[in-house]
Amino acid sequence: MEKQELSTLNHCVFSLQYHLVLVTKYRKQVISEPILKRLLEILRETLEKWDCRLIEGNGEADHVHLLFAGNPNLQLSVLANNLKTVSSRLIRKEFKKEISKTYWKPVFWHRSYFIMSCGGAPLSVIKKYIEDQGSKG
């Protein structure tokens, strides 16, 4: 079993991990290996600017998965949109010839995203633990 890493701020101890999925506009298959490699570099750097840490990242031709550790001060919707904006702008600039074959407008990501908290005990275990608080024996 993997030991859970705890982080601290002035008034709290926490362990927050998130799974984020970003999908290309119209699910077009535009993410080649070189684009994926560069995307992961951009996303890692952007996460670090938000005081987050990329644990794992990978993807396929039409989407990327990011597993990252965050902190309690994160506004997840703002972070997700910043990740999409920064990476879209840089990828479209650096891979203009390749991207323009698929997208004629300045787009790359779908406007939606998927994010889920993960790690720690299953919900059923936490629920049982809370239910049992205050009971003796």
Positions of PLM-derived features:
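Basic nucleic-acid-binding interfaces
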Residues: M1-G137
